[in-house]
Amino acid sequence: MEGKKNNKPRGLMVFGAPCSGKTTFAQKFARKFGLAHYDINEMMEEHGFSREEALYVLELLMRTKQTFLVEGGIDTEAERSEMRNLMRKCGYEPALIWVQTDVATIRSRLKMRFRSVSKAKEYFDAATAEMEAPIDFEKPIILSGKHTFETQTRHAITGLADLVESK
């Protein structure tokens, strides 16, 4: 049986709690496969863009029709839906990768980052207050933020292949 061929570029949304390992995974995955990696929150903070401006820049970048990863600014179902719609409008096939890590590990990583228990707690509480777990129709590819990059990559590739097969 011949596999289904999907010629659309992929827009990979990488989602997870702070210090879950999403940025580490996204950067390594992008480097391994020669993909662009964008962070909406970083675009807004470092360049002073509004969310709309950051999404417009992404829309311009999508004209390249190259598969890419994006993280940040996709913490709610509404934000992810907006991103999926933009990707589809630009001819991309969206996929959601959800990096999960237990809360104890996240808190430990945040304590190391901030060198303060109170600052770590404050940051975690603020960052997760509005966060919404993906719902079934989003079909997230779930990765552990504690697994090796090689294991994460195998799971991500398998999950992406499964999405193609399910169409």
Predicted regions and their residues:
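Phosphate-binding P-loop
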Residues: E2-P9, L61
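Conserved nucleotide-binding/hydrolysis micro-motifs of P-loop NTPases
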Residues: M43-M44, D75-T76, Q100-T105, T148
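Small-molecule kinase domains that catalyze NTP-dependent phosphoryl transfer to phosphate-bearing small molecules
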Residues: R115-A156, L160-K167
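Hydrophobic anchor at the beta1->P-loop junction of P-loop NTPases
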Residues: V14
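Conserved beta-strand scaffold positions in the cores of enzyme catalytic domains, especially
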Residues: H37, P94-L96, P140-I142
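Conserved phosphate-donor/acceptor-positioning beta-strand/loop module used by diverse small-molecule
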Residues: R88-L110
